[in-house]
Amino acid sequence: MAAAPTRRLTDDVPADVERRLRRLCLALPDAYEEHAWVGTRWRVRKRTFVHVLGVDDPVDGAHVVMTFRAAGAELEALRHAGPPFHVLGWGRDAMGLTLDAATDWDEVAELVVESYCVLAPRKLVALVDRPDPT
């Protein structure tokens, strides 16, 4: 019996998606960009807060995924939100977001900032302009 086809991870990320994420991520204190084992990642103090990569899935087709970190009530809400969000199955606070034509880039900006704040040292988080939750 032949094995079921598996998804393949790729560097195939549209330039405009990578450009938008780069602008958001590099605006954060001490953030830097590097090529990951696949795709591109943005880090703070050697901790990845955003990673973007292509996924070629035999069932769902090719798409782009942004991985990020979340915490607390936001993490629980995202775990139950359904598409375009998905639990990655690794890391207690890791989530994925499929990026496509319907992506809300204001929401992506908020997710990027929150992901950064989950992983960055407190002194750097204090420098970030975060929206007032009230």
Predicted regions: what is each one?
Residues 1-134:
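Charge-dense, helix-prone N-terminal extensions
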